[in-house]
Amino acid sequence: MASYKFKTQNSFLLLLSISFFFLLLLNKVNSTGSLSFSFPKFAPNQPYLIFQRDALVTSTGVLQLTNVVNGVPSRKSLGRALYAAPFQIWDSTTGNVASFVTSFSFIIQAPNPATTADGLAFFLAPVDTQPLDLGGMLGIFKNGYFNKSNQIVAVEFDTFSNRHWDPTGRHMGINVNSIVSVKTVPWNWANGEVANVFISYEASTKSLTASLVYPSLETSFIIHAIVDVKDVLPEWVRFGFSATTGIDTGYVQTNDVLSWSFESNLPGGNSVASVKNAGLSTYAA
């Protein structure tokens, strides 16, 4: 497993390659088993999302996952936002698996940069998924150990190092059925800066890749793992974001998502709960 920190030129090449794959998927979205949506910003009382616990959309169109009171983040906060329509990640009849690309931008800001906690994650889970434990479990796990019944795949952006399962320092991680990541890379979190994230899953190679770019700082981070989603996830899933703040006093941060898009293709799929047949429409500002 190689991890990299890129400067300007390599950041551009990384984004170019991810964008190319994104465009390949766009060319396929008219096939039967496809799902596509874009939120350039969010709307208050957003009908296309399921909000859990503290998550809400602000009057300025920001998806605020964890609680903020008078401009100050709250401790012991947990919030999740899921796309409203279930998503067929694989087809039990054909055995085919969906490829997908998702991109989103977020800001994590902390009153005290030395005491951040706990993090934000993009995840896929069973359709009936509910918020789980606070703090280091990021709202998506009940305990820190591998359990195949969890049926969860996540990419985490972890701002607090839990000594029982995390590497030292802030990091990105890929999680499969456990808060103990199968892969991690160091992440130089930038307080209050916009982070652009690109996550792709290529079904033919079972390759899950995530990159994070800070345009203002000209730095990027990338992580990759082989994940067989057909072995890990149920045929139908929900997906979205989860975030938590710390348990202890002072260990807090904002967890704000600014925009989000998603494209997928399931070859030969014939029953995908797409935006249209879920009774929803793609939202645009």
Curated annotation (Swiss-Prot):
Positions with a binding annotation for Ca(2+): 158, 162, 166
Keyword Calcium in record: yes
Residues binding Mn(2+): 156, 158, 166, 171
InterPro entries named in the record: ConA-like_dom_sf, L-lectin, Lectin_LegA_CS, Lectin_legB_Mn/Ca_BS, Legume_lectin_dom, Leguminous_Lectin
Xref: PROSITE patterns: LECTIN_LEGUME_ALPHA, LECTIN_LEGUME_BETA
Protein name as annotated: Seed agglutinin 2
Glycosylation site positions: 147
Domain of life per record: Eukaryota
One function term, GO molecular function aspect: metal ion binding
Tissue localization of expression: Expressed in seed.
Signal peptide annotation: 1-31
Source species: Robinia pseudoacacia (Black locust)
Subunit structure: Homotetramer.
Family, per entry: Belongs to the leguminous lectin family.
Keyword Protein biosynthesis: no
Organismal lineage: Eukaryota, Viridiplantae, Streptophyta, Embryophyta, Tracheophyta
Alphabetical UniProt keywords: Calcium, Glycoprotein, Lectin, Manganese, Metal-binding, Signal
A UniProt-annotated Pfam family: Lectin_legB
Post-translational note: Mostly found in non-glycosylated form.
Known function: Seed lectin.
